[in-house]
């Protein structure tokens, strides 16, 4: 073996790669080099011998061994975990390897990392696993860990404390904050923000877990425009699509629809938000953060009326149903809803169903076949000759539309998981009856970022 550092002689650095590939040496130990720009596909073992603070560098170092090569069956990664600084973030390193799960890193660690990519395996010694669990518990996964990080953030980062800087510096999934807390209250408890007493704090803190998933540019832009001037808006004079977007926001925060924009209760709730400058400011900052993170193209879907739902955006059940003028979404217990006034069939699909959440008669087999075709199983009581089955089959001739909303799991780390709107779909064919197995043809293809999740049940 040899060791290389930044000031090693050029001749030694230039010959090291050939000597490793030829087998003349078995290991190259490096410090602060080989992070990027070095390609040695034959590398089949990577050792991490000290903590790496930068997530980017960690992934670059791991990537040195991820190339395919002849006679290379796998990559073995040995990460020797020492007594690292208590602020060292193990959680983000494992989260980067677990991008296809809605479970927490703690859950994955305790259950053997069941969600790592196919062909991968993570094994930890018992003491190392406990050390990482302790690190995570003292880091971002609990109140005291968040408060500790917030209290020293500006000193640690040389950045002003705000939500965007905090999440970016620590590579943080902000759902870990908003599953239970508000950033403003945590900042007060950390001693870096003046205390406040606002009427809307409790209800908005609970709503943040739902607001954190909003990713429609059109909806966010509307909210950013109207929220700062709530006490100077005639809500009943808003246009149809704007009223629907405000309705979606109202049910997100107060968990019920606004039946009348001029009712005392509705106005009192909206004005209480206008009278809560600290929480309103955080709400606006969260929406701005969400907007900055959108990485796909969203667009309106033509449904025959001014509908605020946009293609490939994320919505809770309540949000999407009030957007379609169905004002009592809590009454729905199944994953289907026929809206005769709008001539719409709404299909709410959960791909990965657990036995404890679904009965044997509701464990439907739902998955995408490719980017344009989706296999969907109807309710177990729906036959192909029933009025519902006939409506599915002949919806185009009858002038109705089918809307497909899909989520991977029932819950995520923020609570109840929202749905992704895959747009309208047309009946192609079916087999069976009670239940019907229908193949829908989507009118817009599923983007690559979603297809890996929607077809996972048939490719693995």
Provide a role label for each language-model segment.
Residues 411-460:
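Compact mixed alphabeta submodule
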Residues 1-35:
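Conserved helicase ATPase core of P-loop NTP-dependent helicases/translocases
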Residues 51-98:
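Conserved segment of the helicase C-terminal RecA-like domain
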Residues 28-46, 63-67:
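SF2 helicase motor core recognition
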Residues 41-45, 53, 70-76, 399-402:
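Short glycine-/polar-rich loops that comprise or flank the Walker A/P-loop
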Residues 240-346, 351-354:
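Charge-dense, extended regions
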Residues 189-191, 198-207, 213, 217, ...:
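Acidic, glycine-rich low-complexity segments with interspersed aromatic residues
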Residues 94-233:
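Long, largely alpha-helical accessory region at the distal end of helicase-like NTP-driven motors
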